[in-house]
Amino acid sequence: MKKNYIFYTLFFLFSFSINSQVVLGDGDILNSNVPIEAYYGYSYSQTIYKSSQINASGSITGVSYTATPSTTLTTSGQWVVYVGLTEKETFESTSDWIPISELSQVYAATAEAPTTISEEGVVTITFDAPFEYDGSSNLVIAVEENQDGYDSSSDDFYSTEADQIASIYYYSD
C-alpha cells in the first residue's frame, strides 16, 4: 500500500514586526521524493500545508528543507519554487495537480547561482520577492528541478508520514 507523505521538515520564514520561523513536522522518513528527487534528471512536486498547521499570517520570505548530511546537489541545483493559496486540504489522487497558473514563482536558481545545501544538509531558499500569506487559506508549495544530470540515489530529504495525500510528485529522466 502506498504511504502518503507530507514534506514537513520545512521552515517557513515569515516577516512580521520581528522575524519568526514556522517549523512543521518531525522529519522521520527518508526518500519521499519531495521536494525533489535528485536521482532523476527532472522532478516536480507539490505539497499542501494546512492553515491550522502554519497558524500564522504575513510575508513568507523563504523556505528551508532538511536532507541527509551526505546529500549533494551537484547536478540537481536548478530549482524553481512556486507558492500559492488553495482551499484544498489534500490531493484527491497522485494526479490532482493544482494548476501552475494558480501559483506564483518566488525563486529560480540558475547555472551561475544554483540552489545549494549546507554541510548540515539544509537547503535554504530565500524568495526573490516575499509571498503574502493570509493565514486562513491553505498553502501550496511546488518545487521543480530541471538541471541535466543525476545525483546519488541516497540523496534524500526528510518528511513526515501523513494520513492523507498532502504531497504529490513526478520525476523522469
Walk through the language-model features, giving the residues of each.
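Sec-dependent N-terminal signal peptides
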Residues: N4-F16
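Boundary/junction segments of secreted and surface-exposed precursor proteins
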Residues: F14-S43
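PGST-rich, cysteine-poor low-complexity/disordered linker and tail segments that act as flexible spacers
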Residues: I165-D173
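Surface-exposed, low-complexity/disordered Ser/Thr/Gly/Pro/Asn-rich loops and linkers
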Residues: L30-Y39, T72, I100-T110
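Aromatic- and Gly/Pro-enriched, solvent-exposed loop/edge beta-strand patches characteristic
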Residues: N55, G77, Y82-D163
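Short beta-strands within extracellular/lumenal beta-sheet-rich domains
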Residues: Y40-I54, V122-T126
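A short beta-strand element within beta-rich, extracytoplasmic domains
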Residues: G58-S70, I141
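N-terminal/edge-of-domain interface segments
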Residues: V22-L30, I54-S57, T75-V80
